[in-house]
Amino acid sequence: MKMLRNGYLLSSIALIALVLLLQVTPALADKNPNPGVLPPNSHPFGKTYEEWNAEWWQWFFSVPASKNPALATNGALDCSVGQSGHVWFLAGSFLTSGSFTRSCTVPVGKALFIPLINSWADNVCNTPPLTVDQLRASAASGVYPPSNLHASVDGQAFTDLRSYRSRSPVFSYTLPPSPDNVIDAAFGVSLPGPCWPSLTVTPAVADGFYIMLTPLSAGSHSINFGGSGPGITLDVTYNLTVGS
């Protein structure tokens, strides 16, 4: 955000973004135990955490496997791939437990939506198809019960992370053609295929624990997050350079 030296006033564009970001009632703001993280019942940029949950998965599936951060182990990334708007997404790891350290650059003024642990479910290859309630139960089984949920920025740990659980609305997602998509990369399944007739999948639902970080100041920052769910344990560190 740009501040004018002669009055320390936010620019009009930044002010609008700030108003959209802070759509939290004063009572909620007063009770927020985690300064720098928007409360789970807030509406960052006019959307609920649940809606951002769905958007995270749509972004994740849309990113080619060759550039997908959730398939990366360690090292430098291009965090701009598939990103747009006021909110950028960070990623954990797709179907793989472990500790990962990554680095990338994020523009000033971007809020960050981060999954501590998360899971999704859809009806691909399900015969007969599951109901939405059954899909929700399937997604929940990947993250609940959680343990060791953790998140911190520059060593400042956040608390009460179980309260940041988010269950998405029903959504659709679209994959790039094979071989450069996450399903082909993870399972060796060429798409479209016999039980996956379309690159666009619906219905899908997701469950997980997410935090929405308010924009970080320019400079270097370290973000650590992760946790354990049934069958997966993650500890992820992003060394970020926040710049123009």
Spans of model-derived segments:
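Sequence contexts marking disulfide-bonded cysteines in secreted/extracellular proteins
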Residues: D78-S80, T105, V124, P194-W196
